[in-house]
Amino acid sequence: MIQLKTINPDNWRLGLKVRSDQKQFVSDADRILARAFAYRNQRSRAFVIYDDETPIGMALFYDIEDAYNFSQFFIDERYQRKGFGYQAANLILRKMEQDGKYNKVILCYVEGDEAAKQLYLKLGFHHTGDDDDGEIGMEKMLR
């Protein structure tokens, strides 16, 4: 069963990583933690994604002006192509809905990352037309 656990002193150094050909598209675990700290005043929430008790990925979102920014998300190379990304992203979206502060989620993916693009489309995101130096903007309404 997929679950999210807030990053804490016991789970922040788990060695999670993506394939070498994916590194251009996603931040590594240390950078996600640094970003969570940098955005702490915007209520950043960083999670380790678990399949039962096995850590399989990481995610981060935080508040911006009028939306949640689903900033970082990856599944470890050993657990990809098993549907975990879709399940975990749905849990993140539910957390945002439960929080209830905003109705909108924004994110971006790096141009060329077809796996991310397809995942986000499947989750109901649509393109905004924003392109910030190869980062393609998407958004989704929660309610």
Question: What kind of feature is each model-predicted range?
Answer:
Residues 120, 125:
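Conserved active-site tyrosine of GNAT-family acetyltransferases
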Residues 2-71, 76-78, 89, 95, ...:
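Acetyl-CoA-dependent GNAT
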Residues 76-90, 99, 111-118:
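Conserved glycine-rich acetyl-CoA-binding loop
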Residues 106-117, 133-135:
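Conserved beta-strand-loop-alpha-helix junction that forms the acyl-donor binding cleft
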Residues 96-108:
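Conserved GNAT acetyl-CoA-binding A-motif
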Residues 136-143:
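Terminal substrate-recognition subdomain of acyl/acetyltransferases
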